[in-house]
């Protein structure tokens, strides 16, 4: 059981955030605020969500994309991070797992995920 002050603080952190509903297998486009010196800029990161973990303020998710020379790039983001400007769901994936770590071993067409039909 958490302390009531901690619960109030966490509720305040979550309050203003508008997070879309997404799960493992969905293709996401993230706008990340990057601070370099005294300047800030927005950098996009697009990839497949391979896992979600935790709940509340401490909830995180892992996004994987294939970078240059077919090198996989994975980044872990807290859902309620201040550096996340926006999260957009581009495609809904049809998967039967909550964790898609097997995609780390797949290359090319084998790493594709079917789109969820509406």
Curated annotation (Swiss-Prot):
Protein name: Large ribosomal subunit protein bL19
Role played: This protein is located at the 30S-50S ribosomal subunit interface and may play a role in the structure and function of the aminoacyl-tRNA binding site.
HAMAP family in alphabetical order: Ribosomal_bL19 (MF_00402)
Molecular function GO terms recorded: structural constituent of ribosome
Keywords noted in UniProt: Ribonucleoprotein, Ribosomal protein
Assigned protein family: Belongs to the bacterial ribosomal protein bL19 family.
This protein's GO CC annotations: cytosolic large ribosomal subunit
Gene name per UniProt: rplS
Gene3D superfamilies per record: 2.30.30.790
A single GO BP: translation
């Amino acid at each position: 059981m958490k302390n009531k002050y901690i619960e109030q603080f966490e509720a305040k952190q979550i309050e203003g955030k508008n997070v879309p509903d997404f799960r493992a297998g969905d293709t996401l486009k993230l706008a990340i605020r990057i601070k370099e010196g005294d300047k800030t800029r927005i950098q996009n990161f697009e990839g497949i969500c391979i896992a979600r973990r935790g709940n509340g303020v401490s909830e995180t998710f892992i996004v994987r994309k294939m970078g240059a020379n077919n090198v996989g790039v994975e980044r872990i983001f807290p859902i309620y991070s201040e550096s996340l400007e926006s999260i957009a769901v581009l495609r809904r994936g049809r998967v039967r797992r909550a964790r898609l770590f097997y995609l780390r071993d797949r290359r090319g067409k084998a790493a594709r995920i079917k789109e969820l039909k509406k």
